[in-house]
Amino acid sequence: MSPQTETKASVGFKAGVKEYKLTYYTPEYQTKDTDILAAFRVTPQPGVPPEEAGAAVAAESSTGTWTTVWTDGLTSLDRYKGRCYRIERVVGEKDQYIAYVAYPLDLFEEGSVTNMLTSIVGNVFGFKALRALRLEDLRIPVAYVKTFQGPPHGIQVERDKLNKYGRPLLGCTIKPKLGLSAKNYGRAVYECLRGGLDFTKDDENVNSQPFMRWRDRFLFCAEALFKAQAETGEIKGHYLNATAGTCEEMMKRAVFARELGTPIVMHDYLTGGFTANTTLAHYCRDNGLLLHIHRAMHAVIDRQKNHGMHFRVLAKALRMSGGDHIHSGTVVGKLEGERDITLGFVDLLRDDFIEQDRSRGIYFTQDWVSLPGVLPVASGGIHVWHMPALTEIFGDDSVLQFGGGTLGHPWGNAPGAVANRVALEACVKARNEGRDLAREGNEIIREAAKWSPELAAACEVWKEIVFNFAAMDVLDK
């Protein structure tokens, strides 16, 4: 070892344990445009000051460990350490704080969501000094955004591929999600697409089970969508779930989908993992496939308000990793989703530039520069009576997906699809004429039902179905 190295490492080194805040709490720090910024909801253990808790988060998610180490002298901690630069008390909550942490960009591998999340949320969430910890938001700097491909195609390219403009896209998840044979599954796909839907979908847990192997499903679904296209003159798609037990098997399924000439494949990005997802997204761009993303397992991570990771972070991570659609909740259906919070992360998915807006849960201004946008997918417990609200909430750049709300129609699958298409066209027409969908929605649906027996039957079946439960995740006061 050289004398210079020995001198650098030994000068000022003192073994032992010292408070994190002495090194990692820096309220005077001015954040840089190249820093990744994080907002953590911190609940310290009794007796732990908030400054120490915030500094511990910064340390344990960057360069720190529980004791001083000799090798600290071999690098520049000031260059590489995370810094807790601000602490806010959460109004209305006992012993909860928002700790803002800045991370130098050099801590992260270029183009790797996997590495970014491993660093920021990898170990620190099990830290004993904290009762609970939640990552509320991230600011991804432009310098880091530009190292990612992002969505394979984006909203405008998808519309051009489908030749569909001026309205939300319509989809349907095939039910029952498990148990159908491949041929009966394909039959349901055909009936729904023939009836007027743009897409049908594999459910998240449809992979390759004994009752329906993936290759058989792909073949029958391809036959169904090409037949429906020929009959309707519209471009159709079915989300063929390529999720598999290995990346190699996943890619084999995606390649087969491309060889069949189908326009879109699907991936469960959280259970499948970010490395697999980014690999698939790159393949989809190179080979002209759209990529639908399901967020299965998200509520395990994001539903509790004081611990875990907010979905807006998972949404940003998905936009970086790559996907053309992602499920986003419905606000009005059976799944968790408060309106302002949902609209906040929907904007983070679709827009190029999003201003900080705490009223919608957005902690940082985010500039995506040229990264393509992602279509939010509203799915889960929705039916024709929800159509005005969904059109008003999500606007044109969205996918409205009715599973039971299509296949549960009393006359069958194709009439269920007709009912949804008529309801959507009526709502878009009324909106374009200046009518208030939020106030006049039920009247608009009733008027359309006079001319569509399929819609009238759907209205009768689901007239009393509501899901009135308070959201678990709400904005701070």
UniProtKB/Swiss-Prot annotation:
Propeptide position ranges: 1-2
Binding positions for Mg(2+) per the UniProt entry: 201, 203-204
CC annotations in GO: chloroplast
This protein's record includes keyword Acetylation: yes
Organism per entry: Solanum tuberosum (Potato)
Protein name per Swiss-Prot or TrEMBL: Ribulose bisphosphate carboxylase large chain
Something else known: The basic functional RuBisCO is composed of a large chain homodimer in a 'head-to-tail' conformation. In form I RuBisCO this homodimer is arranged in a barrel-like tetramer with the small subunits forming a tetrameric 'cap' on each end of the 'barrel'.
Subcellular location: Plastid, Chloroplast
UniProt entry keywords in alphabetical sequence: Acetylation, Calvin cycle, Carbon dioxide fixation, Chloroplast, Disulfide bond, Lyase, Magnesium, Metal-binding, Methylation, Monooxygenase, Oxidoreductase, Photorespiration, Photosynthesis, Plastid
Entry-annotated residues carrying N-acetylproline: 3
A Pfam family hit: RuBisCO_large
Leading EC class: lyase
Cofactor annotation comment: Binds 1 Mg(2+) ion per subunit.
Single annotated GO MF: monooxygenase activity
Subunit structure: Heterohexadecamer of 8 large chains and 8 small chains; disulfide-linked. The disulfide link is formed within the large subunit homodimers.
Reaction(s) the record says it catalyses: 2 (2R)-3-phosphoglycerate + 2 H(+) = D-ribulose 1,5-bisphosphate + CO2 + H2O; D-ribulose 1,5-bisphosphate + O2 = 2-phosphoglycolate + (2R)-3-phosphoglycerate + 2 H(+)
Similarity comment text for this entry: Belongs to the RuBisCO large chain family. Type I subfamily.
Post-translational modifications: The disulfide bond which can form in the large chain dimeric partners within the hexadecamer appears to be associated with oxidative stress and protein turnover.
Cofactor(s) needed by this chain: Mg(2+)
List of residues binding substrate: 123, 173, 177, 295, 327, 379
